[in-house]
From Swiss-Prot:
PolyADP-ribosyl glutamic acid modified-residue sites: E122, E151, E172
Post-translational modification: Phosphorylated by the P-TEFb complex at sites next to its RNA recognition motif, promoting its release from chromatin.
Cross-link (Glycyl lysine isopeptide (Lys-Gly) (interchain with G-Cter in SUMO1)) at residue(s): K78
Subunit structure as annotated in this protein's UniProt entry: The NELF complex is composed of NELFA, NELFB, NELFCD and NELFE. Interacts with NELFB.
Compartment(s): Nucleus; Chromosome
Basic and acidic residues bias: start-end ranges: 90-101, 186-260
Protein name (record): Negative elongation factor E
Low complexity bias: start-end ranges: 155-167
Originating gene: Nelfe
Summary of the function given for this chain in its UniProt record: Essential component of the NELF complex, a complex that negatively regulates the elongation of transcription by RNA polymerase II. The NELF complex, which acts via an association with the DSIF complex and causes transcriptional pausing, is counteracted by the P-TEFb kinase complex. Provides the strongest RNA binding activity of the NELF complex and may initially recruit the NELF complex to RNA.
Crosslinked positions (Glycyl lysine isopeptide (Lys-Gly) (interchain with G-Cter in SUMO2)): K78, K82
Amino acid sequence: MLVIPPGLSEEEEALQKKFNKLKKKKKALLALKKQSSSGPASQGGVKRSLSEQPVVDTATATEQAKQLVKSGAISAIKAETKNSGFKRSRTLEGKLKDPEKGPVPTFQPFQRSMSADEDLQEPSRRPQRKSLYESFVSSSDRLRELGQDGEEAEAPGAGDGPPRGFDWSYEEHGSARSSASPPRSRSRDRSHDRSRDRDRDKERDRDRDRDRDRDRDKDKDRDRDRDRDKERDRDRDRDRDRERDREGPFRRSDSFPERRAPRKGNTLYVYGEDMTPTLLRGAFSPFGNIIDLSMDPPRNCAFVTYEKMESADQAVAELNGTQVESVQLKVNIARKQPMLDAATGKSVWGSLAVQNSPKGCHRDKRTQIVYSDDL
């Protein structure tokens, strides 16, 4: 069972007081709103608020306006006739209306206020421009034209007026300004021009001297390089001569080929077509004892080995280029000499190797076995 206390708690009493205060404030606000809304209605007496006015169509509104215009309560609005085109400024319209009057003085914030005295003094303040003759003729030429008294001589055609090709308005202005300038300013300008010309001449001389020094340095460098190259070439030639002297006869070069020594040996190379062993033995046996004879029929050549080298040299001298039994022979000492040691007797087993060599005169004594086709 829940027990509810008969009285209100402190929090409930505080909330109830706040609620009563809010009610009072709300009533006061409603009263103020009513007074503000009833104020304009009581002052005018006729005006109504926009919310209270009835909504009227455009057609009914135009009819009501026409009736009011007819009754004279409202005057009709007149349309202004405007000229179509560009707008003209008011100052221009004033000038067109009153051409005798000058321009109306108006305030221009960014324009400098000038008086008549300042207008007269302005041309004297402007920097004097050189005349056309002075701009074309250098100051050095003008110094030459100066007389002994220091007065400037007349320019060509100056007495007759400006030259024909330079009849410009700029020349007239320049002559007027130069005539108006005092003689002191002229002398200052002349001295200033003289100093400028002197400075320019000095700078030119300095540049010329610098260029000359640079050219001299370049020439010296070139001469040094040439001397270095010459010394290098001399050193190379000396080194080559030293190498030649060191190598002597053992040196081989393509530019100076040396003649080889003649070959020596006891084996001969024989070339000829349709050669036979009997032909070779009959042709070469008179010159010495033959210890080996080998044939190479596909190449039409043969090798003949003597016991002594002297017999081989004699055979080459007599049989080279001769014709034996209608066979032209070419005889030379062979490049390879395999049986030289055996022939000279330096090797113990040389004779046996020569006798049993595959290219020697040894023939196989075995009989060849031939089988019948039936097997």
